[in-house]
């Protein structure tokens, strides 16, 4: 893991941060965590021991994470990957989407996006995009809306994510557009 990109700080997205300590503690290297100012502050408040060393901490303890502020509209570079940070409306809050090397988009926990975000995502090779459930929701995209977004973006391939408990794989797969499939645990893909 070279870095973490935080879309937002709802518990289903950040509660596992503590589990990453095991990967970084032995080598005492810091994992960069990229988040908006507000979401970064929330994470540091919830998990202070991941970012700050207390005076009474053992001498061998090195906080495993470093918070780095990002904002929608910004571009950052992690290794050889250029990442465009995208604004998303998540109902009563905002979330971030990401576009990697101009060919892979990631949009979850989103109910609306500005036109310029759709323009940035146009014709990507792969778009992982939220489709919570069949009926509309105040902060998440539903199946029909996501299908309309896919038609607008025209990705080579779309994978639905953040599926709700009532989303049945076979039923959803049967109504997906030709280039679209529901995501599954363990999904692996390669981009050139």
Question: Which residues does each predicted region cover?
Answer:
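Ser/Thr-centric signal marking residues that sit
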Residues: 7, 107-108, 129, 161
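Binuclear metal-ion centers of metallo-dependent hydrolases, dominated by the metallo-beta-lactamase
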Residues: 114-126, 131-192
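Short beta->alpha connector loops
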Residues: 88-92, 110-113, 164-166
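Binuclear metal-dependent hydrolase catalytic cores
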Residues: 1-107, 173-192
